[in-house]
Amino acid sequence: MTRLITGTFLLLGLLGLPSVAETAKGLVFHDLNDNRRFDPDEKGLAGILVSNGTEVVPTDGEGKWSLPVGDDDILFVIKPSGWRVPLNDHRIPQNYYIHRPTGSPKVEAESIEPTGSLPESIDFPLYPQEEPETFSTVFFADTQARGIREVNFVIRDAVEELIGSDIAFGVSLGDIVADDPALFDPINAAIAQIGVPWYNAFGNHDNNKDVAGDRPSHTTFEKTYGPSTYAFEYAKVAFIALDNIVFKEEGGHDTRIRDRDLLFVKSYLQHVPKDRLVVLFMHAPLRSCGQVEKLLDLLSPFPHTFSVAGHWHRQNHFFLGEDFGWTGKDKHHHFVNGTVSGSWWCGLQDELGIPHAVMNDGVPNGYSFIDFDGVDYQIRYKACRRPADYQMNIYVPMDIPLPEAATTEVLVNVFNGSERSKVEISFDDRCDWTPLEQTRDIDPECLRMHELSPYLDQEVLGAPLEDVLGWKMDFPSRTGHMWKGFPPKDLTPGSHIIRVRHIDPFGPDYEDQRIIRVHP
């Protein structure tokens, strides 16, 4: 252990990270009576992983561990498969100890009070639980609530329909709030009603804006959720939460993976068997993230990997190869999840006063169920308050003159489509399915909604219509989950059914239909 700690001192110094001054010690144990204290009749657990945020060590045969710790570190146990950790009233894992002897900088939202000297022993309780290899999870991106009104949008639009769902746990991919960490408490209380453990990633709108620099900006997030980079295991899946939002002293932020977080990933992966699925989740997509090459180099030896991000308020699938540092088999699948807040809660309000919030790529606001079966996974995107099979929009005029029928474009926005999707079209009761051509285009309905902006600038009774009816939509973004094609040349006058099906290698297959009228 002396050599290991000395090596850690040298490495942290080379990285420009704070040097360590103390050694923390503790125990991981089976808490038989659920009192979160180690009692004489309870036993320590061997081989459980504990971390200080950079180094990961297993407990010894008696469940004991020791790690170097600085004066601004968080120590945590990595939940192993088949065990659970304590939760607080908001169902947030309580598997960590914050070591901040003098406390955090004072911030407007909740600060971290001085923790004082290290305890003699920092003990982490665990509890056994069954974890079948087949399980479901739910991933939220960017709930991004501005004020309690938008917290209520999250509740009405997403949380209420998830209560009682058969899921193992949930994840928020950052931007939990919109620049107001004081809202963590009400939004956590709401999400807790879903009834499952909930893990959280740090987003660029989850920071404390009243302090400068990277570490101080994380104050209320860490007070509320614990470490922003961490890991846990469930069944045959190793999950890694990665904080890739770095706040600068002069203001603003970068999307970059810190050296210390790369150290953590490297150290943790040394303990992960190669037959496991490794899933990373984070806020900013890896395509726009500094040091992604180093991260993917660490992941490349693992045959089963997958990652999820939010941030863009668009839905995308990327397959990252050598250009991003990936040297493994096939390419790394990186999924950019659609957001609960959609287009930042913009758009006309519906009959319940909730904005439609369609994203700028035409995907409705929503969240994803990600189902796991051993090392396999599938993604089921769910539009908020819409049927589960609402998976595409088919754009075509309803009334088409017969001479124009064969040249009238059918445009399909497949919400969860990717370059590996197969999208096909058929008409009426014909048995033949014709492939559609993938294209990059803007969503026609998004464009129409954007063109309402001048009307929303008008005032009625002294109030802008935008404040009364809903916020204006941005100009739509061009997206690649669009497909196009044309009707057959032999359509006759009358009503016809257009059928479109999406064969998805990463999720269930879906079919939808539209009716058109062809007239002489």
Residue ranges with predicted function:
Residues 24-30, 63, 124:
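A short, amphipathic beta-strand motif
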Residues 38, 44, 54-68:
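Short, acidic Ser/Thr/Gly-rich low-complexity loop/linker segments typical of extracellular
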Residues 104-185, 488, 520:
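N-terminal active-site segment of His-dependent metallophosphoesterases
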Residues 196, 443-486:
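Aromatic sugar-binding surface patches on proteins
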Residues 32-42, 412:
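Acidic, glycine-anchored loop motifs typical of Ca2+
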Residues 94-103, 108-114, 181-274, 291-308, ...:
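Extended active-site neighborhood of metal-dependent phosphoesterases/phosphodiesterases
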Residues 52, 74-110:
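A short, solvent-exposed loop/turn motif at the edges and junctions
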Residues 327-417, 421-424, 486-490, 496-513, ...:
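Binuclear metal-dependent phosphoesterase catalytic core
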